[in-house]
Amino acid sequence: MRLRFALLFSILSFYTISGQETFTVNGVVQNFKPIHVFTNAHIILSPTSEIENGTLIIKGDKIIAVDTSLDIPSGAIIHDLKGDYIYPSFIDLYSDYGLQKAKKGQYSYRPQYESSRTGAYHWNEAIHPEIDASREFVTDKESATAYLKNGFGAVLSHVQDGILRGTGSLVLLSEKSEHENIILPKAANYFSFKKGVSKQKNPSSLMGSIALIRQTFLDAEWYSAQDNQTNLSYAAVNNNQELPNIFAVNDELDYSRVYKIANEFEIDFIIKGNGKEYSRIDEVAATEFPIIIPLNFPIL
């Protein structure tokens, strides 16, 4: 039975491997990059574009050409894929791959009103937009293998805790080092209405979470116009404004809540849905939010 190739060319095609290392190499540096040519394949480029009897050329870790008729480089290793398909990989846009999960502190019967964090940060522990996933990312070979078996080639990973959660990183699922797997260190901002592991008393309700988000945006706007103090949380809100904004909702009712925040502060949100959007489909559609929808296939 012919080996069927699942090539992750949607990722490799825009990811360039630099010839210069940023860390020491034990032994002789290997600069040779083998060339693999896959011929006679049905290549799916996008939902609306495909090539029959196509040829795909890979040099090292980078796709250098895809077409129906290409000149094959001398010395290339040729793979005849007649009858086989080559697809782009999936990308998980809502993952915490390679990151440690946030942990709750020890229980105390006394209510906590002040933040226990030290430093020039926001006064509420659930607001931490300064968190940068790329600074905490560690390649996880076991988890990566599970992803790869299901057709994923990359993930957008962030710390899934808090209300303003910080930035996520776009990373490859290879066994290589963190230096090579991180494609975009800061790829998106993440939000939710859940306070997460914070033990502070506030916010204690959904209304409180909404108020805290609005107040944070207003404070960040004020902060941008002053130079008397430093607040790393407000600075992160302002510095990362141009990134995509992904908001995780708890249920279908949250769409209207996020919509009001988006209108007030002129923010374009992408919604990470929960699969219950069908119950208020007209209201959800009216927001015109791009939505990341979970898939749950039946067990075969």
Region locations from a protein language model:
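Bacterial Sec-dependent N-terminal signal peptides
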Residues: 1-25
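Histidine-rich, glycine-flanked metal-binding segment
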Residues: 21-23, 28-29, 34, 43, ...
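Short, solvent-exposed loop/turn and secondary-structure capping segments
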Residues: 49, 68, 100-105, 167-169
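Polyanionic/metal-chelating signatures
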Residues: 140-269, 277
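Glycine-enriched alpha-helix->loop->beta-strand junction motifs that scaffold or abut catalytic
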Residues: 262-268, 285-292
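Short, acidic/turn-prone active-site loops that include or flank metal/cofactor-
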Residues: 274-276, 295-299
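Active-site-adjacent beta->alpha loops and helix N-cap segments on the catalytic face
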Residues: 276-286
